[in-house]
């Protein structure tokens, strides 16, 4: 019979994939598998090691006791990472600047470029060093941090003394100083900025000061714009905001707040925030008495809860996306549906921790995994699915409606069943019983010996 194969349960099994074109080999229960699809190859010894290669996008991923140690490569870019703390990376940027980074977080940082030495830096934290294009800053220089450091972001330079207690800032029409939390002042003049479309925009100025932060604050924002804003605070006595688009007043913060948002067209009362909130208007309708109940919605969002966190519901509707998520006690139960309002197609995921996870993709493919202690908390995490999910997947079931294929596996193929329009295969108890049917050709095996065989001609 064409296509005859032997199955040995969780000792060894080789089969076609159900949800996509390709083949998979599993052996030693959950501790080895390899998989080949049209573009991607996977090889793994869960949970110790896994390797994925996708030649079509020049991508490779190595995991060693994930997430203990990982290596990612995308084209010429590569990165080693150890528990998100120690990392080494390098490769060729789109600007053709060959750069290599080394990090032993948080003590050592370095970068070397083969083509532009201006990109080089070295830092030995907290003693001395310079960083470039790190931590959302163009440049960071420090000496015996926190005694002294200097940061630059675009045209704004900040000199810090005994960070975060003292600083002097200047640049881009702005200057100021702070001795935190005692006193501070900063102001900026109105400036012009050219956006990405070549249009000149006005960047508003401001005047800000504080003393005994955050008890006493004074801010005038948006100077020179169509929405100048005045904010004053003497906490906990009062805070207020006044602007053409919004008025807000708080008395005995955070107990009593009234808000009139003319831009978004709603009024809101908070008594106190965030526990008791009522809002009414075209832009927002909210009724919340936390943790008893809460209902909130506007044109695109809906959020409800009852006896939080026992039941929560959240919906986002913005064509062509409609996303709904229902949760019971955080991740104990979760049902997420993402639907295209244009085509009507949808994908869905249902998790019940730690018992199962089930998902359906936009093509209608379905997959059920029984026992899932990590997947509900970190859904769609390839590292978890590749290195840890095989260890506790006691039952797997997959269905492909387009091809008509389906498969079920119990205890790492101790029992396995595959069906397709012209194919059926059943294997039980290490393959001691096997049945296979391809078209009209049938075969039955006991103890790996053929005991019955028929062909279509018969």
Which role fits each region the language model picked out?
Residues 2-458:
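Outer-membrane beta-barrel proteins and related beta-barrel translocases across Gram-negative bacteria
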């Amino acid at each position: 019979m064409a296509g005859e194969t032997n199955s040995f349960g969780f000792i060894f099994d080789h089969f076609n994939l159900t949800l996509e074109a390709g083949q998979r080999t599993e052996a030693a229960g959950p501790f080895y598998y390899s998989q080949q699809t049209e573009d991607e190859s996977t090889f793994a010894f869960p949970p110790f090691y896994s390797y994925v290669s996708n030649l079509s996008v020049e991508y490779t991923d190595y995991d060693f006791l994930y997430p203990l140690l990982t290596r990612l490569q995308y084209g010429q870019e590569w990165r080693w990472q150890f528990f998100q703390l120690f990392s080494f990376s390098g490769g060729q940027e789109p600007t053709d600047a060959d750069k290599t980074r080394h990090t032993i977080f948080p003590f050592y940082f370095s970068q070397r470029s083969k083509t532009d030495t201006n990109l080089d830096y070295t830092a030995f934290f907290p003693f001395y060093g310079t960083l470039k294009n790190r931590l959302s800053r163009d440049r960071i220089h420090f000496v015996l941090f926190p005694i002294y450091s200097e940061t630059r972001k675009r045209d704004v330079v900040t000199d810090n003394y005994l960070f975060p207690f003292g600083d002097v800032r200047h640049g881009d029409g702005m200057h100021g100083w702070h001795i935190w939390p005692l006193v501070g002042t900063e102001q900026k003049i109105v400036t012009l900025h050219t956006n990405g479309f070549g249009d000149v925009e006005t960047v508003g100025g401001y005047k800000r000061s504080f003393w005994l932060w955050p008890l006493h604050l004074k801010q005038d924002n948006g100077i020179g714009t169509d929405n100048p804003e005045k904010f004053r605070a003497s906490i906990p006595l009062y805070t207020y905001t006044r602007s053409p688009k919004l008025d807000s007043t708080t008395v005995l913060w955070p107990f009593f707040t009234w808000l009139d948002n003319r831009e978004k067209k709603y009024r809101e009362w908070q008594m106190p925030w965030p526990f008791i909130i009522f809002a009414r208007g075209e832009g927002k309708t909210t009724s919340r008495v936390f943790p008893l109940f809460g209902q909130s919605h506007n044109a695109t969002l809906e959020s409800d809860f009852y006896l939080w966190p026992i039941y929560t519901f959240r919906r986002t509707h913005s064509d062509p996306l409609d996303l709904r998520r229902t949760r019971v006690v955080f991740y104990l139960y979760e049902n997420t549906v993402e639907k295209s309002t244009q085509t009507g197609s949808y994908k869905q995921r249902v998790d019940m921790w730690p018992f199962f996870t089930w998902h359906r993709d936009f093509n209608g493919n379905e997959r059920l995994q029984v026992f899932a202690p990590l997947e509900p908390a970190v859904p769609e995490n390839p590292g978890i699915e590749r290195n840890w999910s095989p260890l506790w997947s006691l039952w797997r079931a997959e269905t492909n409606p387009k091809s008509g294929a389906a498969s079920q596996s119990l205890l790492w193929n101790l029992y396995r069943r595959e069906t397709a329009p012209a194919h059926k295969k059943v294997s039980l108890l290490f393959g001691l019983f096997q049945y296979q049917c391809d078209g009209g050709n049938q075969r039955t095996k006991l103890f790996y010996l053929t005991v019955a065989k028929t062909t279509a001609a018969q």
